Amino acid sequence: MGNEAGPIFEESNAEVGTPPADAVHDDFFFDYKNATGYADDCNITGDCNETDDCDITGDCNETDDCNITGDCNETDDCNITGDCNETDDCNITGDCNETDDCNITGDCNETDDCDITGDCNETDDCNITGDCNETDDCNITGDCNETDDCNITGDCNETDDCDITGDCNETDDCNITGDCNETDDCDITGDCNETDDCNITGDCNETDDCNITGDCNETDDCNITGDCNETDDCNITGDCNETDDCNITGDCNETDDCNITGDCNETDDCDITGDCNETDDCNITGDCNETDDCNITGDCNETDDCNITGDCNETDDCNITGDCNETDDCNITGDCNETDDCNITGDCNETDDCDITGDCNETDDCNITGDCNETDDCNITGDCNETDDCNITGDCNETDDCNITGDCNETDDCNITGDCNETDDCDITGDCNETDDCNITGDCNETDDCDITGDCNETDDCNITGDCNETDDCNITGDCNETDDCNITGDCNETDDCNITGDCNETDDCNITGDCNETDDCNITGDCNETDDCDITGDCNETDDCNITGDCNETDDCNITGDCNETDDCNITGDCNETDDCNITGDCNETDDCNITGDCNETDDCDITGDCNETDDCNITGDCNETDDCDITGDCNETDDCNITGDCNETDDCNITGDCNETDDCNITGDCNETDDCNITGDCNETDDCNITGDCNETDDCNITGDCNETDDCDITGDCNETDDCNITGDCNETDDCNITGDCNETDDCNITGDCNETDDCNITGDCNETDDCNITGDCNETDDCDITGDCNETDDCNITGDCNETDDCDITGDCNETDDCNITGDCNETEVSDAADGTDGMFLKSSSSLKLVALCDGCPTEDSPKSSNAKGKGSSVSAGLLLLAGSTFLVLAVGLSAVLFLGRERQNAVVICDNEVMMEEVPGCLSDASFAVPVTQSSDEARP
């Protein structure tokens, strides 16, 4: 050829010797300091000061300070060990581990874990979907939405909304001025000051003061050792143990034990269904409904109704201005002043004065040692021993002994069925006629109509074969058998069985403690409380609350507009329309439509054969079998199997711990967490996270826009479109297209017969067999065989440790490390290298096949450099070579009779080295901005980069 290298080489064939030790890598290296557009990992060990936007698509490891004044968009992990000061938005989709202070003044959106050991000051929104562990102060002035655990050991000051769906453990002060919605445990050891709503569904353990000015709804235990000042509603369904003062100005509804050792001042309603032990003063200005024991050692001043179903032991004064209904023992050692009705079904022992201005109904013993002045009715079914004066101006019905040692003045009817020993005056001015109140303690057998215009108190059986029209209250403690219509306009309290074969129309409350069998329509406009079975064969229309503790079997429509609380089985064969909450603890079998607009809490099986439309939360702990459509707009939490044969549309979270078998479409817009098998034969559209720990078999399309974590097999026969991460630990068999835009980590086999398009990392530890195209833009790490029959385009690193057989083109722009056989029958284009570093006084390059080095000079070739006609590289013996262009320096490797092609980035011109002679078709221009390196392998008859 005769051509010489000219100015390109100082020595065309000189051996330069060993390059500097710090410039030698295992395979080859080059200087990429001046390269632009590098879009893979960045690893920085010194300060990093970036004064404009930083956009990183690979890992970012920074071991010293990072100071960023533009947007920072990181789409993979960021690990920072120095201070990080970001003055504009930070958007991170991988883990972020910061071991020193982070100060952010723009939005911070993190879609994976954040672990921070220094202060974190965020002055705009933070949105985090992975765990967030902060071991020092966090100060946030924008919204904070955390969808996984947050663990904070320093102060946390949040001045806007915080929404947390994982555990929240705060070991120092939390000060929140926006709404706080926590759907899992919160454990707080410092003061907690919340100036807006707090809604907590997990345990809440607060070991210092809590001060809340918005509603507080807690659906699990609250344990507070400091003062608790709540200025709006508190609703608690778990135990509440408060060891210091509680001051509440809104309603307080507690459905489990409350134990309070400090003063308790409640200025609105309190509703408690567990024990309530108060060891200091309680001052209540709203209704107080307690359905278990209340034990109070300080004064108790209640200025509205008190309703207590457990023992009530008060060791100091009780002053009540509303109704007081106590259904178990009351023991009072101080004065008791009640200015409205008192209704007591247990013993009542009062050792000081009782002054009552409303009705007093006592169904067990009353023992009074002070004066008792009652200015309205008293109805007593147990002994009544009064050792001082009793003065009564209303009816007095006593069905057991009354022993009175003081004057007794009764100015209306008295009906007494037990001994009455009065040791002082009794003065009665009213009759006892059935045209007013009737009080009967024996059987009552009426074979025709009974028409009563006053109260009817029957303490034994009533048997009626004609119509019974009662225009005032009926109170029955024995069986009541009515074989024709019953029409009642007052309260009806039945404490034993009621059996009715005609219509029953009750326009006020019905309270039944025995079985109730109604064989025709029941229409109730007041509350209905049934504590044993109800069996209804006609329509049942209830326009207020129904509370049932026995089985309820309804064979026609039930329409309920108030709460319905059923604590045993409900079996309904007609439509069931409930427009308020339904709470069911037994099986619920509905064979026609159920339409529920309030919460529905079912703690045993639900079996529904008609449509089920629920417009608020459904919480089910038994199997749920639905054979027609289910449409749910609130959360749905099912802790056992769900089997659905119609469409299921859920517009909020679904959390399922048993199998879920759906034979038609499922459309879910909230998170879906399934901890056992899901089998779906219709389309499944999930617009938030899906987390599945059992098999998932989908026989039609699955479209998921949130993370999808599957810990067992997934078998999909329709398209699968996932727009966030998919993490699968079992086999994944997909027989149609899979399109994934987040990471995909599969730890067992993947078998795909349609196209697979993944726009983020894919990590596979089992075999992967793809029979159509695979297009991957993130790293792909496969630790077992990959067999692909369509094109495979990978735009980032691929690392494969098993055989890889590709029967069509593969195009890879990142590193590709394959440690076993690769057999490719189509084109394979790989456009990146493995490693790089810079040398001294020019660049050194080492080949794995030869140690012969060529020294390179700076500068571009001149125009009068020699040219050759065979510069395209054909006709020479060609083996492996390497092309490197960086800045204005050519980097050339010459190995024996090998050739290297140089491609200019802009003009596609070529430089060929062959037999140590330079051949060129056209000398490229100065490529100062060139920034790529291409390893090249050519055949002997055509050199193609």
From Swiss-Prot:
Spans within the Cytoplasmic topological domain: 904-945
Region (66 X 12 AA tandem repeats of D-D-C-[ND]-I-T-G-D-G-N-E-T): 40-831
Residues of this chain annotated as glycosylated in UniProt: 34, 43, 67, 79, 91, 103, 127, 139, 151, 175, 199, 211, 223, 235, 247, 259, 283, 295, 307, 319, 331, 343, 367, 379, 391, 403, 415, 439, 463, 475, 487, 499, 511, 523, 547, 559, 571, 583, 595, 619, 643, 655, 667, 679, 691, 703, 727, 739, 751, 763, 775, 799, 823
Coiled coil: none
Annotated spans, Disordered: 1-20
GO biological process, one term: endocytosis
Pfam families for the chain: CRAM_rpt
Listed name of the protein: Cysteine-rich, acidic integral membrane protein
Gene: CRAM
